[in-house]
A protein has these predicted regions:
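Extended ligand-binding groove/face enriched in aromatic
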Residues: 56-121
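Bacterial Sec-dependent N-terminal signal peptides
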Residues: 1-13
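Well-ordered alpha-helical scaffold segments within catalytic/enzyme domains
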Residues: 24-40, 48, 53-54, 96-111
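Solvent-exposed loop and edge beta-strand segments that line ligand/cofactor-binding
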Residues: 13-24, 34-41, 80-95
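Short hydrophobic/aromatic-rich motifs at helix boundaries and adjacent loops
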Residues: 1, 20-23, 74
Length: 121
């Protein structure tokens, strides 16, 4: 059973919470201060969830310290990460927020790819 943590400002403006990603994004920003790139807006929850799927490791977990809202090539980012950051981890509040976010996006979209990715996590 998924726990939904959607934030709402109006009935038409429902988005999954991004608060669980703040620690990892903060660490990403510390490591990549000079990097300039586009970022998804919170209302682009499908694109953010697709990012989560793109970064998901074969064991179902995720690397740490990623800007999940970044419009970046996931393969290039993963290749540039130090080995210890590529591995799946629970460090820096990692993995549980991804599962929760994917579950919330599944509840909003009924798209099984988000449910399947959450279950793999």
């Amino acid at each position: 059973m998924a726990v939904i943590s959607l934030s709402t400002s109006s009935a038409q403006d429902i988005t999954p919470s991004l608060s669980g990603f703040s620690d990892g994004i903060h660490h990403w920003n510390l490591e990549h201060k000079d990097r300039r790139y586009s970022r998804y807006e919170p209302c682009q929850y499908r694109e953010i969830a697709d990012n989560l799927i793109a970064y998901q490791n074969s064991d179902g977990g995720w690397p740490k310290n990623i800007d999940w809202l970044g419009v970046l090539d996931a393969d290039s980012v993963k290749a540039a990460l130090k080995e210890r950051y590529r591995r799946s981890t629970l460090d820096n509040r990692n993995t549980f927020p991804q599962i929760e976010y994917l579950s919330d996006v599944y509840l909003l979209t009924d798209d099984n790819k988000y449910r399947d990715a959450a279950e793999r996590g």
